[in-house]
């Protein structure tokens, strides 16, 4: 079961935005009833062990929403408008055996805060949520992986193709191009997940 550390300041911000007063002691006492066992509650945050069947509670946003519903009887009915987009993503047939299912979506109207700190906290929380989904539902990216990108910095249409190990690009947090072979040997994330692609001779990009 994953154990996560949630920041008091982020949880307080989220609850205040929804008219709820955040009380970490109340969480310690009552949240175990919905599969959230509190391991530690210190000055910085609250550490919670999430039950395996509650993968919907792996982020600040989702656990704060669950607490509003459970502790404060706030009704929540998601109302998302979903429509067909006009951005094309072409998947090369050679990808079928590597990644048989590929999905994409554009999410708009997300409130990521006003101040620089709020925006930074939002991005950090989003990345942590992504990694926890990789670890749990994605089985360390063996079954599934997620990519989150800033659409304003990308130019559609998008093409998903397969390449060999000599293909080069600039990986995350690097300032120079690296080949896939180099990434799998020396980049932190590449080394961490190299085992997922150890039997591949083609790689999806």
What function would you assign to each model-found segment?
Residues 1-205:
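RNA/tRNA-interacting regions in translation and RNA-turnover enzymes
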């Amino acid at each position: 079961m994953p154990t996560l550390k949630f920041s008091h300041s982020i949880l307080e911000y989220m609850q205040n935005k929804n008219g709820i007063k955040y009380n970490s002691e109340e969480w310690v006492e009552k949240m175990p009833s919905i599969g959230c066992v509190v391991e530690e509650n210190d000055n910085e945050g609250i550490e919670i062990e999430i039950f395996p069947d509650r993968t919907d509670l792996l982020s600040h946003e989702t656990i704060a929403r669950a607490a509003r519903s459970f502790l404060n009887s706030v009704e929540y009915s998601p109302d998302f408008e979903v429509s067909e987009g006009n951005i094309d993503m072409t998947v090369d047939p050679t990808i079928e055996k590597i990644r048989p299912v590929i999905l994409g979506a554009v999410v708009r109207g997300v409130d990521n805060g006003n101040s620089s700190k709020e925006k930074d906290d939002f991005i950090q929380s989003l990345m942590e949520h992504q990694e926890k989904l990789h670890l749990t539902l994605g089985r360390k990216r063996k079954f599934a992986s997620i990519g989150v990108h800033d659409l304003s910095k990308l130019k559609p249409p998008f093409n998903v193709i397969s390449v060999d190990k000599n293909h080069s690009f600039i990986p995350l947090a690097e300032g120079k191009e690296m080949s896939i072979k180099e990434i799998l040997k020396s980049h932190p994330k590449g080394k961490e997940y190299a085992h997922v692609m150890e039997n591949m001779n083609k790689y999806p990009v």
